[in-house]
Amino acid sequence: MTRLLVVETSPRGNYSISRNMTRGFVAEWQAAHSDGEVTTRDLMETDLQFIGAPWLQAYFTPSEQHSPEMKAELALSDELVGELLACDHLVVATLVYNYNVPAALKAWIDSIVRKGMTLGFDGKGLVTGKKATVLMASGGVYTEGSPIRDRDIATQYLRLVLGVIGIADVTVVAGGGAKAVDMRETTMEDFIETLQPAIEAAAA
């Protein structure tokens, strides 16, 4: 069975462009993988805390020495890592805030980059044999030829992090210019339609 893991980050529900991109992707993916299984991790519905001192203490303590409190501290991180390792295809659906990923996605990343689980002690990624698709909605346009292409920190960051943990096969579907929907210069449906060929190709 082929498994898809979808990580959602937008707080905007049905008004979210990245979530609408996800809907199109999942529909195409399910059509191509009739026996596939989809798991959705909605970061807006996950009590994901930023890393603090108790988490770090648990992280740097050998597992056989973990107290019940330490185990509880890492429980959600363990769950998120398990979801990632179980999937064949990872989808990260995200918006862009000030040129980079939102805080919730950064918190998810900090929870899944784990030495001995997703990253070897030699620095080599352990999440191999998988592919990833990034569905990104941004107000600005950062694709090839854009005068502000160098501001595309979000794409560079996600490619870097995914590569570090071992996922080299990364496709980015860039929904640049998404502010046109909020400014009512275009409709959500028309905007998503322009991205549909890229979404279909990524889901194949």
Swiss-Prot record:
Top-level taxon of the source organism: Bacteria
Reaction it catalyzes: 2 a quinone + NADH + H(+) = 2 a 1,4-benzosemiquinone + NAD(+); N,N-dimethyl-1,4-phenylenediamine + anthranilate + 2 NAD(+) = 2-(4-dimethylaminophenyl)diazenylbenzoate + 2 NADH + 2 H(+)
Root EC class: oxidoreductase
One GO molecular-function entry: oxidoreductase activity, acting on NAD(P)H, quinone or similar compound as acceptor
Entry binding sites for FMN: S10, S16, I17, S18
Swiss-Prot/TrEMBL keywords: Flavoprotein, FMN, NAD, Oxidoreductase
Cofactor note (record): Binds 1 FMN per subunit.
Coiled-coil zones: none
A UniProt-annotated Pfam family: Flavodoxin_2
Cofactor(s) required for function per UniProt: FMN
Enzyme Commission numbers on file: 1.6.5.-, 1.7.1.17
Protein family membership: Belongs to the azoreductase type 1 family.
Protein purpose: Quinone reductase that provides resistance to thiol-specific stress caused by electrophilic quinones.
Quaternary structure (record): Homodimer.
Protein name (record): FMN-dependent NADH:quinone oxidoreductase
Species whose genome carries this gene: Granulibacter bethesdensis (strain ATCC BAA-1260 / CGDNIH1)
Species lineage: Bacteria, Pseudomonadati, Pseudomonadota, Alphaproteobacteria, Acetobacterales
